[in-house]
Swiss-Prot record, chains A, B, C, D, E, F:
Gene3D superfamilies: GHMP Kinase, N-terminal domain (3.30.230.70). Belongs to the RNase PH family. Keywords: Nucleotidyltransferase, RNA-binding, rRNA processing, Transferase, tRNA processing, tRNA-binding. Phosphate binds at residues 86, 124-126. The lineage of its organism: Bacteria, Pseudomonadati, Pseudomonadota, Betaproteobacteria, Rhodocyclales. One of its GO terms (biological process) is tRNA processing. This is Ribonuclease PH. Its EC number is 2.7.7.56. Transmembrane segments: none annotated. It catalyses: tRNA(n+1) + phosphate = tRNA(n) + a ribonucleoside 5'-diphosphate. SUPFAM superfamilies: Ribonuclease PH domain 2-like, Ribosomal protein S5 domain 2-like. Homohexameric ring arranged as a trimer of dimers. NCBIfam families: RNasePH (TIGR01966).
Length: 238, 238, 238, 238, 238, 238
């Protein structure tokens, strides 16, 4: 039995709100149950030094958690003067995920930065960030098309992410915080709209897991991502 | 004529939403027109080293701006590894303002941290932070009373803040970003519910200002703070 | 009764010594009683990146306190690896004050940095820094004129600063350390030679202050600045 | 055809040299072809603050790369003043992997730090670090047993790691640098001696990968880890 | 011929002014010609962690250079967020020199910090720091004796330092900046009042130097230190 | 009697292994008894900003110690976020020593960085670094000659370094760790192949030393360096 009474293969309620703030070229609030992440896309008309003159663009991501997004206050990274290893790991993951579905040459010599800031955390913030940031990225590229700066949107496919895990012996989809902090295996799967796997990160927190368990978990994740892609489509259609 | 068509003594629409997030002891979204700041209050049952064993509590504040809260993206302080001078100045101001209306001895040996994070900026973020943080602080203290940890709320009076300035030669109340970036004098006034001045910071961006101008500006601010205190009361009554 | 036996409207002895060190384009030791600040002006023939090619100059300030300028040794900021919020707040204030009285276009594409280093502290170091730095700035500009690099001194007016406050219930001018650490209200006022207000920063350390108190304090400050401007004139005439 | 002429399922030559340096409680040089990592285990008789008094030990890891371990010199992290996100990601991975096979309660209130320093890099440094660090950890625990500080070695099983990937369309085992920098999918698999999966991290550098490809890759990795575990056993028996 | 017209074995004018500032337990301005260093000694009634409970005290030093102590402004270390290698090297040298002549056991469990801040630089600032800091240290210990905290001054002997070098082929004593920046060999010698060598640091900036040259340089330094010790004695007697 | 049973004028066994790693232009493992330092030379085809366009090259050095190179683990500088003063002092020394024997103009506008990383420490790491780095530097320059980028090797002479000291009252050559941590005087001498002194750094850890002792120590060092230069020659001839 899951603490939230959800079925093993049931996602939390997903809500994707576009135009949550007004300055960014793409601005999306994504909610997965009580997890809420603000994802903004900012377009800059230049690229980082290592790409100058190479005729292609770049997509990168930064991730942050408001100090009191969590049950107990965590210290502010800006005040401590450095980002934790966890933060850096997550923002690298988000960047890789998004770059896997955009044609960087078609983007031209510009950079899009996705800022994913967690306003409230209840597990699964890195997956929600990827799913929400994709919408913000798509929106920002659309504005470049509308402004006549690009002939077509260079985003080639959807990308979304979901966590799965083994909780009290059973495989479950979309772990919330109570599950996440008490599970045996935790796996994040990033997939495209076409169903290709872009990234898989599975960790045994307790007992090692087996090939069979892994297979069931990826099945669950595939199901979850399919729902998330549908939610992205609805959000863009709205 | 103000860009927003407001009267010289007209505040922007003020909205104070309590319980905006669920983990913090106090959580308030304050909106002054398009400026939106999330203020959370976090209670910790200990005090910083310099106060240990002194039989009193402490109230402190931290301030941050999401990278794309502004028209163009500003770099993330956590990524740069340090807070700007502006950020430090603002968080020191918020802390002083709140400490002026709370009985720290009555609070006991605990610390309350107010995190003010700007989700969207359109001028006046430090004033909005003070006004919103006061509500979050009050709420957090109320919970301590409800939990039987304090006999009475140690917050003795309201405190709120507003900016005033001389824009195109005329004194105006509550500057928004277009006014703020093009005014001659910019003044932030922090006042209590009883009308006492807690802090005044006036800066001539262009021409120096006179005693008379200063007097008119403080009148306007007094009016503005009165409205803000009423908004705080409504929010608490809701 | 003031600890120093001064009258409420009496400044400490002001001494401004030019050419205190030999390398800087302007070098001034200012003493306000036991407070001693070394202010040097350094001219560089280029401007910071944000001003390049804009046809104007820049004036900026840095502030430091020697570790044992104070009663007990404070740790060295260079050793800790960062400047405190207080230091940053003060150096921003000094920079703004000086920029308010210089014609940056007339200065041309060069930068003048004012270093204000406190050799001995007895209250009022930020105000002494502004008053002393103005002399160093003027002197540095004069050398540019003498060297034929500028047709006329771009400094348009004096600027000086003084603290006022409410000590044991009475308004007093030019707080020294014993007063500063035990006063109800502390206000720093920056004014031009013509009497315009450039910056006012008032803080209630204890009880909030009233409009009437504020008015008396600004009167006292006006008086104080007038004396300081005279001291600046004497120093330049010497 | 692989650049190294190896068969798709062929590991590079593995060499594990114990007692490579003399001060550490465990000191192992692991070589996977031209990749060489020095892994040392250091025992300290206390635990980090978050574990004090909890009756258990801790195992953690740090990772570094000598500036010229690589084809072109990379800058020294100590000189830059911070570790890259990649470094932090790797050292977190090594720590998790090792903790998965040690009984931390049986270790008692002591910490073992595994330092993995890459002397020469040719791909697969994080996997080599895990495989080598396990030997150093085992050795350090053995010394605690010999010294009578522990009744039995708390390491419960082997753990080793290997990279697999899709290179020029074909699944291959143990990527070297030329393969790693030109592959479509790169996957690191951490497994125990009993064959359980502890961690799996797969990333599509180019095209997304399929369930079937993933399955073949995990088969290859299982084979590779089996060889590595045998190499660990030989090294301990030597 | 030396730029300053001095004889090869002639020191610059030495001036040691005690009580230059009022808060420190020892406060000395030392001038070697145009080089001016403020040396303060601060006594704290505890020792650094590595000495706690060992029944002895500690003497340490910090060194800084005001940004415009030099011909062209150098950037402020506090603003850059770190001390240069040169600064660290010098403060380590000053600390070692002073510790060589004090009985740390007799000092008891307290620490004396010597802050050496260069107000104006014209070569030889590290040597002047040592010579001046010794006087400040002696003075601070004397106050501990006068306060009844120590039975006798734990400083056992004088220590002073001087630079020597080979300038235009000739050995000279006490290099000033024009000589220092254009010499072949630069040597700093730290000696006790009894004539023992505490530290010698010689560097060939151009051609390597010979045993014979080294011998002549140490002779010159011995002479110089003898004069400096006399100056220290006069300062203490004043 | 020395702990190692060596004669007072006996070096530890010196071993210089070239091509210890494969990527660097010069790669040398130097062993002085149990002290082992990996020295690599990296050539870059540009110079640091302060030398651009000056028609000369630059040689610089960085130094590091693996955390468990020592008896007890020391913390990793990259993790702490800064290099110690000792590290900076050593790397500055290595750089100066090498620059003293290379014709920087003949090197052309390129920079060679010597990375000296201590794999195992038993005293004398800075001296071993200089002696080993010289071989790596020579080798890297040789490769530039072989590649036709330089007409001749710009290294003009050997340079090597050795420590000497007064241990239990007697002058000894090449201190190992047990001697180094218990000696009265410790001196590092850097000399050229021609016998010129490039750098001498002597420190009295206990009693000050005399002119006579200094003379004996330099004699010993001269002897030691002669052996080291021979070892460098053998290594290059191999």
């Amino acid at each position: 039995m899951r603490p939230s009474q959800r079925q093993p293969d049931q996602l939390r309620t997903v809500r994707i709100t576009r135009n949550f703030t007004r300055h960014a070229e793409g601005s999306v609030l994504i909610e997965m149950g009580d997890t809420r992440v603000l994802c903004t896309a900012s377009v800059e008309e230049n690229v980082p030094p290592f790409l100058r003159g190479k005729g292609q663009g770049w997509v990168t991501a930064e991730y942050g958690m408001l100090p009191r997004a969590t049950h107990t206050r965590s210290s502010r990274e800006a005040a401590k003067g450095k980002q934790t290893g966890r933060t850096q790991e997550i923002q690298r993951l988000i960047g890789r995920a998004l770059r896997s579905v955009i044609d960087l040459k078609a983007l031209g010599e510009r950079q899009i930065t996705l800022d994913c800031d967690v306003l409230q955390a209840d597990g699964g913030t890195r997956c929600a960030s990827i799913t929400g940031a994709w919408v913000a990225l798509y929106e920002a590229c659309d504005k470049l098309v509308q402004a006549g700066k690009l002939p077509a949107n260079p985003v080639r496919d959807h990308v979304a992410a979901i966590s799965v895990g083994i909780y009290k012996g059973a495989p479950v989809l979309d772990l919330d915080y109570p599950e996440d902090s008490d599970c045996d295996t935790d796996m994040n799967v990033v997939m495209t709209g076409a169903g290709g796997i872009v990234e898989i990160q599975g960790t045994a927190e307790g007992e090692p897991f087996t090939r069979e368990q892994m297979s069931v978990l990826v099945d669950l994740a595939t199901l979850g991502v399919r729902h998330l892609v549908a939610a992205q489509q609805s959000a863009l259609a709205a």
